[in-house]
Amino acid sequence: MYGITSTANSTGNQSYANRLFIYEVVGLGGDGRNENSLVRKSGTTFITVPYARMNQEMQRITKLGGKIVSIRPAEDAAQIVSEGQSSAQASAQSPMASSTKIVHPKTTDTSVPVNIYRPKTPFLGKCIENYELVDEGGSGTVRHVTFDISEGDLRYLEGQSIGIIPPGEDKNGKPHKLRLYSIASTRHGDMEDNKTVSLCVRQLEYQDPESGETVYGVCSTYLCNLPVGTDDVKITGPVGKEMLLPDDEDATVVMLATGTGIAPFRAFLWRMFKEQHEDYKFKGKAWLIFGVPYTANILYKDDFEKMAAENPDNFRLTYAISREQKTADGGKVYVQSRVSEYADELFEMIQKPNTHVYMCGLKGMQPPIDETFTAEAEKRGLNWEEMRRSMKKEHRWHVEVY
C-alpha cells in the first residue's frame, strides 16, 4: 500500500514533419499573410501550419497582433478551414469556431511548445502571488511565485522551464542574462484557468572566498523580493523536453528530488491527484522520495501529505531529512540513502516497461544511485549501464541535476 514514509516506446516512426496543424487565431491583420494589412479586431482566422513551421508561425502571428486561441492537429478537425475566412463562414463550416477554449494536445514531440518567447522579445508577466515555503526553523528562503500570463500566448507542459531576465546590468554594463527555473504548476496553472505559471525559487546566497562577504544571487533575489503587482517581469520560453510527464495514465512514476528540485514534481502530482482535469485521469502509481535538511524545509508538505492520505493506493511519499534522521550505521539520510534502503523494490519497478524515473536536484545524488542500481542489476545477472541506456532511449529515465 502506498502512503507517507519518513523512516529508514514509441508507437510509430511517422514523419512528424508531414503533419499539419490548425491554428485558430483572432485579431489577425487582413488574410493573415500580409504584414502590412490592417489588423482586424474581431473575427476568427484558421491557418493550416506544417509542424516544421509551428514556432515561426507563432512569432509571425504575434508580430501581426493576432492571438492564438487553439491549436489542433488537422486530422482532428471535421474539415480544414481555409485561411482568411470570416468568423461567420468559419462557424458555419467548422466546430472549432464556436469555442475559444485553448486546446492542449497530448504530449508528443509534435505538440511540445518551445521558445514561444525569446530573450529579445520576452513576455511581460505580472506577479500575483509570492509567499514563503520554508517553515520556522528551516534553512534558507524559498518562495512560491505566480505570474499572470493571460495577456500573452505562453503555453507550457509539466516538466518544462521558463526563463526570467532580471532588470539592471552586470558589472560590465551589460543586461543581466536570463536564468532558467523549472515550472511548479500544471499546464492549466494553479488557478486551473490556463492563465498563470508558478515557480519555486530558492534565494541563492554564498560566501565570497576572498572577502568573506555574503553574496546573493541576482535573479533569485529579484524573484524572492518581487512585490505582488509588479507587471513587467520578463519571461522567456518555455524550454525543455527531458522532464515531461508521460501521457500514459497508468504509468508508474518514480520521482527523486532535493530542495527546489521538487518544482516539476509538484506539477506532476497536482496534475495526477489534485487537479483531476478532464484531459488527464491518473490511475497509475507515483512514488516521491524527497530530500531536505530539516522537516521545516519540506516544501508543499501539507499538500503532499493530503494527497498521499487521500490516494493511499496510488501515491507513496518518502522523506529523507538529512539533519534529523540517521541511517542504520549512523549516517545522514539523503535521497540516495532511501534509494539504497528500497533498492530491491525500486529495481523491480523500473524493470517494468511503463515505469518512468525522474531525478531533479543536486547532482551529488546521481553517482550513489547509479551504484545502488548497478549492484541490484548484478544480483540479477543484468547490466545497469545497458539498462539505463535503454531506458533513456525509451524516454523512461529523466535526469535534471545541477
From Swiss-Prot:
Low complexity: bias regions: 85-99
SUPFAM superfamilies: Ferredoxin reductase-like, C-terminal NADP-linked domain, Riboflavin synthase domain-like
EC number(s) stated in the UniProt entry for this protein: 1.18.1.2
Catalytic activity: 2 reduced [2Fe-2S]-[ferredoxin] + NADP(+) + H(+) = 2 oxidized [2Fe-2S]-[ferredoxin] + NADPH
Keywords recorded for this protein, A-Z: Antenna complex, FAD, Flavoprotein, Membrane, NADP, Oxidoreductase, Phycobilisome, Thylakoid
Pfam families reported for this sequence: CpcD, NAD_binding_1
FAD-binding FR-type domain residues: 120-245
InterPro entries in the record: CpcD-like_dom (IPR008213), FAD-bd_FR_type (IPR017927), Flavoprot_Pyr_Nucl_cyt_Rdtase (IPR001709), FNR (IPR015701), FNR_nucleotide-bd (IPR039261), FNR_plant_Cyanobacteria (IPR035442), OxRdtase_FAD/NAD-bd (IPR001433), Riboflavin_synthase-like_b-brl (IPR017938)
Intrachain disulfide bonds: none
Cellular compartments annotated: Cellular thylakoid membrane
Binding site for NADP(+): 182, 202, 260, 292-293, 322-323, 332-336, 361-362, 400
Major enzyme class: oxidoreductase
GO MF annotation list: ferredoxin-NADP+ reductase activity
Region called Disordered, residue ranges: 80-101
GO cellular-component term (any): plasma membrane-derived thylakoid membrane
Annotated FAD binding sites: R179, L180, Y181, S182, C200, V201, R202, Y206, V218, C219, S220, T260
Family to which this protein belongs: Belongs to the ferredoxin--NADP reductase type 1 family.
This protein's name: Ferredoxin--NADP reductase
Species lineage: Bacteria, Bacillati, Cyanobacteriota, Cyanophyceae, Oscillatoriophycideae
Designated gene of the protein: petH
